[in-house]
Amino acid sequence: MMFFKMQGLGNDYVYIDCINGKEPIDIKNLTNRLSNRHFGVGSDGLILLCKSKVADLKMRMFNSDGSEAQMCGNGIRCAAKLAYELGLICEEITTIETLSGIKTLKLNIVNGKVKTVEVDMGAPILEATKIPVSSSAKIEDKKVKAEVKVKNKKIELTCVSMGNPHAVTFVNDIKNFKVAEYGPILENADIFPEKANIEFVEVVDKNNIKMRVWERGSGETLACGTGACSSVVASSLNGYTDRKVNVQLLGGNLEIEWKPNNHVHMTGPAVTVFKGEWIDE
């Protein structure tokens, strides 16, 4: 089985072309094995490029634990790059179907290769039941607020969905914050019926934030596109930043803009690392 290893700011996935080939049968098991960084290819998960009846193509995304996710911002940029360079799509503007809806993408092409991709991520979801977060959450001036107690410390969260659930908390020293300690507790908190991706954000100024992320089903990763979008929405709603923000992640920077039409746009790189053949012994 041929595959491609790709990454967006270090958020890396294994990609399989299921338009010219067949979809794997036991996807969860395959994802577990491919994602293993010692005994497999090594990745944050698996992404399948599939045929779509409503868009140019369909993206199915699986976390490293085999669970299927609605959307991945870094993953969809790489999916668009791969589709273009394989000849599955031919235009600079394309559409990709995901479990969180159809996304429109603009490809920046240099010498026949896709360098960066701008994604219209759609409008943020700011209704508690649709994020989803339990009824214990409070609504404060369009913000969905929640509190989780971790080791006798109350962690305040601003909850947002970009097609998948996110909870953003603001910290003073992101570099030394114990993400691996707090992340899994917050991810699995009872207030999140579908669990949640957790963003830890340090505000630098009105146009810059630093972010680390604990991804649902994957743990801490170097970057998360939907997380960056959610963090900018939360930062803006809380009055910490403007609506156009440079997000500094462990793997690099993303440009996020919450447009006047309420849609969030994300621009960032997409890189092919290598292609190979998975030998299933």
Please provide the spans of the model-predicted regions.
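A glycine-rich beta-to-alpha transition motif near the start of alpha/beta enzyme domains, typified by
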Residues: 1-113, 167-281
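N-terminal, positively charged, Ser/Thr/Ala/Gly-biased leader segments
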Residues: 1-22, 119, 137-160
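Membrane helix-loop-helix hairpins that form the core translocation module of multi-pass transporters
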Residues: 115-124
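Glycine-rich beta-alpha junction loops
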Residues: 123-125, 162-166, 270
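Extended Gly/Ser/Thr-rich low-complexity repeat segments
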Residues: 128-139, 275-280
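Selected transmembrane alpha-helices and immediately adjacent juxtamembrane segments
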Residues: 156-157, 165-168
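Membrane-interfacial helix-loop segments of redox and metal-homeostasis proteins
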Residues: 160-162, 184
